[in-house]
Amino acid sequence: MAGFDKRVASYEEALAGLEDGMTVLAGGFGLCGIPENLINEIKRKGTRDLTVVSNNCGVDGFGLGVLLEEKQISKVIASYVGENALFEKQLLSGEIEVVLTPQGTLAEKMRAGGAGIPAFFTATGVGTPVAEGKETREFNGRPYLMEESITGDFAIVKGWKADHFGNVIYRHTAQNFNPLAASAGKITVVEVEEIVEPGALDPAQIHTPGIYVDRIICGTFEKRIEQRTVRK
């Protein structure tokens, strides 16, 4: 069964083949369940002109925010970007492009991409700037927008446990966008807290089957949390 073993020994090996100009899908929600070590490896590699698809773009100095420091991202497709001052600066100066997408629509774009569905219709965004330039059709008397699905050259994902074959379990809310991203990457790389022997995972508990996963690596994680400041 050696040919089914998805484990890699280093983060350099995990991201082998990532090149300038590629599209990267990144799991996580805020700072919860983000593939922080894979992001740091992208920074180390110096890969540039990336299109990044994620719920948000991290914070200053952590998560996807570290890729902004050397201007490695040229375009972001996300739902929320308000926590990152460096992102704001680059956006206002025209150094980075942003496509704001409703959160549920973004999730469905990834899910559809992973399922091989090229497009779908949604009522979300009708009558707003989100609808500009998009096909609109009426179903049962209600207008809907056509949204195209999303796939990536790479998907970087954070899991809790995986076996040698790449079957992955996520931990509580750290699941978030991770399984969606995992399904929609041409090359999907998952970093986890623990790798177990084949057969050790309950098949009923597996969230992402190994068929979607190309590489897995075990890492250690800082797991920062976001603090809401209401008064200074």
What do the PLM-derived regions correspond to, one by one?
Residues M1-K232:
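Conserved alpha/beta enzyme-core scaffold
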